[in-house]
């Protein structure tokens, strides 16, 4: 299956501490993916993850239309959202647009506490939206729960709430990068075609982390390799992409070593 993780807009209303939006040294294009670019995505990929590195997909001004197009092309989609600053009617429109979409709601803690990390989030409102998606629209939903000190004692209660609601429950123990004191095998996931990333600039990238390290891969973010100017097949089969994959075998970028390390002898 050909998969891509899209950053379709530059907008988000949250101030999550771990998000690259909060790093003022990180620059990104303030633009939305165009309908033409999205057509090219749907014509190549079988599955789309709407899981922005700097954005929440619900803020794309044509998001409902994008969801409709994906469904018409038989492209499966996962929508990752944590923001809560849309009217209920807007969520209804999105749920109507693609009943086959899988929605992942980022509520990190009991709904009343999630804002402690997801600053500006109304977790209780978002929980009600998730309930509406499941009850009224029969949407396949997952409650995603990142574990922090403030919410680790509430995991079992939240899991019970998810079970009562009839939605899946997924926990994440987050870590940014790897422990430099330990020895790791280098296993870049992009080599097995697991999932391609995407930047708000309109460029496809080997993985989602690459957006934060574009200065290390200037050859992949040239204008002629953007979705505005080229189709997906020509981009991923370009000499620049082939050269990058070859470089992984001899001289990989530092960020690849950081995010693609697996502890030796781990199960």
Where are these regions (language model features)?
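Conserved alpha-helical substructure of the radical SAM core
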Residues: 1-102, 113-124, 128, 136, ...
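Processing junctions and N-termini across compartments
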Residues: 6, 10-13, 184, 250-253
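Conserved C-terminal portion of the radical SAM core fold
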Residues: 7, 44-52, 76-80, 99-109, ...
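Short cysteine clusters
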Residues: 12, 16-19, 190, 207-208, ...
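Short catalytic/ligand-binding loop motif for oxyanion handling, primarily in non-cytosolic enzymes
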Residues: 15, 27-28, 58-60, 111-115, ...
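Extracellular/secretory pathway and lumenal proteins
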Residues: 16, 23, 194, 211-212, ...
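Catalytic cores of transferase enzymes with a strong primary signal for eukaryotic protein kinases
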Residues: 66, 74-80, 92, 103, ...
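C-terminal accessory region of radical SAM enzymes
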Residues: 128-140, 160, 164-180, 203, ...
């Amino acid at each position: 299956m050909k998969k891509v993780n899209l950053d379709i807009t530059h907008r988000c209303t949250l101030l999550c501490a771990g998000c690259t939006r909060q790093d003022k040294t990180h620059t990104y294009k303030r633009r939305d993916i165009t309908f033409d670019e999205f057509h090219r995505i749907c014509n190549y990929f079988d599955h789309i993850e709407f899981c922005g590195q700097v954005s929440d997909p619900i803020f794309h001004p044509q998001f409902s239309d994008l969801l409709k197009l994906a469904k018409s092309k038989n492209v499966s989609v996962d929508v990752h959202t944590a923001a809560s600053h849309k009217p209920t009617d807007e969520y209804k429109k999105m749920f109507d647009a693609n009943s086959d979409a899988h929605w992942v709601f980022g509520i990190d803690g009991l709904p009343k506490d999630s804002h402690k990390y997801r600053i500006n989030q109304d977790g209780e409102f978002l929980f009600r939206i998730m309930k509406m998606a499941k009850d009224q629209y029969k949407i396949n939903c997952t409650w995603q729960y990142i574990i922090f000190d403030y919410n680790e004692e509430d995991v079992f209660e939240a899991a019970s709430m998810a079970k009562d609601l009839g939605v899946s429950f997924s926990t994440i123990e987050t870590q940014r990068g790897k422990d430099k004191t330990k020895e790791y095998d280098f296993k870049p996931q992009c080599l097995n075609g697991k999932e391609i990333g995407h930047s708000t600039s309109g460029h496809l990238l080997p993985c989602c982390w690459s957006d934060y390290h574009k200065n290390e891969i200037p050859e992949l973010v040239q204008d002629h390799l953007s979705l505005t100017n080229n189709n997906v097949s020509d981009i991923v089969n370009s000499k620049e992409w082939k050269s990058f994959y070859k470089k992984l075998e001899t001289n990989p970028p530092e960020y690849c070593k950081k995010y693609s390390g697996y502890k030796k002898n781990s199960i």
